């Protein structure tokens, strides 16, 4: 199994619109993130938008997506801070339906949207950013995120990754969703297996046992390209549910992070995390009680993350 340096990572300002990365507050937020977490790695996630899960065209040139120049500037700035960078161009749906539900008929039907047309647009989207990854010296290119209903289209995914490799010579990964690691049958064509680690606080050992079988089968490095828990009461039991509403539970979020780190430390094959997520518009630390989301800034979970990442940096 090829090894990779341990990833003490954070997903920074995913899906921000044009203009966001040109603001000084975004750079200040990135500096604060590095100082407060001891992170050595970030994922940047440009936003590609299609109208619905059954739309064939992905747009990444509108005002809803950071410009190429902004993205390059943020990559360069992050690297100047000593951060390793990965790009994860991500397809989303304008109507708010989660990208995992992007799906088409398996057999082409006249007058109906088709996988072939969608993958052609998706490949163009990914290749555009793969060229930026190569130009800017990014360490990794992550070819997609939580595209659950598409993952059985093995031929198209292999073709997409082969095309990306023509433009990008670094590490290539794909970020599958929680509970799906064993359902991807084409891990052999990526360099690094990654997934979204939103597992209940009391289920980490069970899920890691399952994932370990996949890692052993394919003999690839593994990390969690996303992982996080909201500081909302109940989130630690179902951390993937961003619709949970309730009172603030700062300690519950911190406990979830500590449980994840403790469980994964027993597994040498877990090579890190890119935690979800850190905003480009930080709230005032005094207002933390008003923020029950995945953010960890000025919350007890931030201390848990900093301690773990500091320990890994010294190892």
Locate predicted features.
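Substrate-binding cleft and catalytic face of glycoside hydrolase catalytic domains
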Residues: 6, 39-56, 70-150, 279-281
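Glycoside hydrolase catalytic-domain groove-lining segments
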Residues: 66-68, 73, 80-84, 88, ...
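Active-site neighborhood of glycoside hydrolase catalytic domains
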Residues: 124-125, 140, 147-175
């Amino acid at each position: 199994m090829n090894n990779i340096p341990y990833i003490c990572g954070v997903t920074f300002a995913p899906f921000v619109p044009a203009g966001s990365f040109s603001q000084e507050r975004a750079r200040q937020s990135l500096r604060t993130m590095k100082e407060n977490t001891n992170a050595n790695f970030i994922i940047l996630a440009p936003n590609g938008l299609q109208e619905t899960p059954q739309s064939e065209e992905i747009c990444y040139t509108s005002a809803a997506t950071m410009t190429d120049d902004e993205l390059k500037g943020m990559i360069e700035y992050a690297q100047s801070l000593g951060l390793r960078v990965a790009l994860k161009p991500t397809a989303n749906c304008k109507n708010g339906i989660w990208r995992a539900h992007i799906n088409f008929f398996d057999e082409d039907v006249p007058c109906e949207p088709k996988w072939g047309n969608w993958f052609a647009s998706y490949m163009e989207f990914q290749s555009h950013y793969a060229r930026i990854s190569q130009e800017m010296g990014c360490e990794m290119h992550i070819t997609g995120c939580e595209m659950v209903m598409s993952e059985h289209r093995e031929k198209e995914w292999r073709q997409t990754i082969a095309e990306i490799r023509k433009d990008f010579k670094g590490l290539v990964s794909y970020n599958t969703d929680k509970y799906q690691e064993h359902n991807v049958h084409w891990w052999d064509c990526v360099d690094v297996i990654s997934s979204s680690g939103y597992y209940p606080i009391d289920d980490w050992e069970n899920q890691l046992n399952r994932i370990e079988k996949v890692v052993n089968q394919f003999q690839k490095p593994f990390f969690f390209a996303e992982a996080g828990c909201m500081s909302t009461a109940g989130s630690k039991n179902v951390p993937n549910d961003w619709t949970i509403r309730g009172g603030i539970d700062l300690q519950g979020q911190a406990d979830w992070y500590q449980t994840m780190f403790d469980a994964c430390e027993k597994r040498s094959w877990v090579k890190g995390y890119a935690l979800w997520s850190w905003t480009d518009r930080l709230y005032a630390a005094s207002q933390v009680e008003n923020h029950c989301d995945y953010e960890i800034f000025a919350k007890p979970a931030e201390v848990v993350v900093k301690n773990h990442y500091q320990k890994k940096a010294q190892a």
